[in-house]
Each structure stands twice: as C-alpha cells, then as structure tokens.
Design a protein with these regions (language model features):
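Helix-loop element at the rim of GNAT/NAT acetyltransferase active sites that forms part
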Residues: 6-20
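A short coil/beta-turn micro-motif at the C-terminal edge
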Residues: 65, 112-114, 142
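Conserved acetyl-CoA-binding loop-helix of GNAT-fold acetyltransferases
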Residues: 76, 82-96, 115-123
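Conserved GNAT acetyl-CoA-binding A-motif
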Residues: 99-109
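Conserved active-site tyrosine of GNAT-family acetyltransferases
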Residues: 121, 126, 148
C-alpha cells in the first residue's frame, strides 16, 4: 500500500488526476482495502531492472457486467513515466479485457491538458468519444475532461492471449 500511496502523492500524479490535495496513508489504506473487496481487475506493472522485476505501476479495470464495459485506470511511478511502460501495460490490459473478460468496450476519462497521457492512450487504441466541459482542474485552472473509449476492433493485433488458446 505504501508504494502505491507514494506514487499517488507525486505532484505530477496529483495534477494528472485533478486532485487538489494529497491523501493520507490511512485513508489510502482503507480505499485500497475497499477496492480489493470489489470486482475490480488489477494488474501490477513491473519494470525489469537488471533482470529483477520491480513494481512501477498498476492498471485497473472497473467492470460493469450488465453492459460488458469497464472503466480503465492506470497509474505509474514517477520514475517509470516516459519509457513506454504505460502504453505497453494498457495494451496488455486491453488484450485481457477483450479476450478473457469478453468486454465489448473499455473507456476512461483524462484531463484535456494532460497531452502525454492522451497520446499514450491513443497509441494503445483509445479514441476521443466526447468532452466533459469544465469537469476538472489542471494546475489550479478549470479544464475539460476527455472521455475516451476503445472497442476490440480498435485494438491492433497481435494478441498475447489468443495464441495461448487451443
């Protein structure tokens, strides 16, 4: 929990999520315990440093089984950003979402000024589906939030999972 909490307290993470204040470790511990009891699908992102796996992020799918869709959330440690790990982790998570969980659509929200995140999501197969006007804050200023989504047909093959099936 402390590792994830540290990543979330990074100023760039706070800005990227549009939060105005950090969260206490106690509150985050309760929040993670609640999340782990739910139906969320979580994956830890690892970076192979000198051949040793080191956790550097997490991806999460928050499924809505009644309509076979899920919200997507990703968080990377500050030291893991800009290396392509977020895009790779997003592609793998989408592969799982579409080929194992059989979701029909995955969506996310991102603050419009967060251009690096928008580009990474586009590289992974997401498209802008709409704009939530004045829905967030970026560096203390009101900003729009983009709604992005992707379908199985939007995600480029190859699938890591498909070859494993008989």
């Amino acid at each position: 929990v402390e590792t994830y909490w540290r990543w979330e307290q990074d100023p760039a993470s706070l800005i990227g999520y549009g939060r105005q204040q950090p969260e206490s470790l106690e509150a985050r511990t309760e929040g993670i315990a609640h999340q782990l009891r739910g139906d969320n699908i979580r994956f830890t992102v690892y970076h192979l440093t000198d051949g040793t796996p080191e956790p550097v992020g997490v991806t999460t799918l928050l499924p809505d089984p009644s309509v076979r869709t899920a919200e997507y959330v990703v968080m990377l440690a500050p030291e893991a950003r800009g290396m392509g790990l977020g895009t790779a982790a997003t592609r793998l998570t989408l592969d799982y979402a579409f080929h194992i969980t059989n979701l029909r659509m995955v969506w996310l929200k991102v603050l419009a000024p967060n251009k690096p995140a928008v580009r990474a999501y586009e590289r992974a197969g997401f498209r802008t589906a709409g704009t939530l006007r004045q829905a967030g804050y970026w560096l203390g200023q009101v900003c729009d939030e983009l709604l992005m989504d992707t379908l199985s047909s939007d995600v480029s093959p190859p699938s890591v999972i498909s070859p494993l099936m008989p």
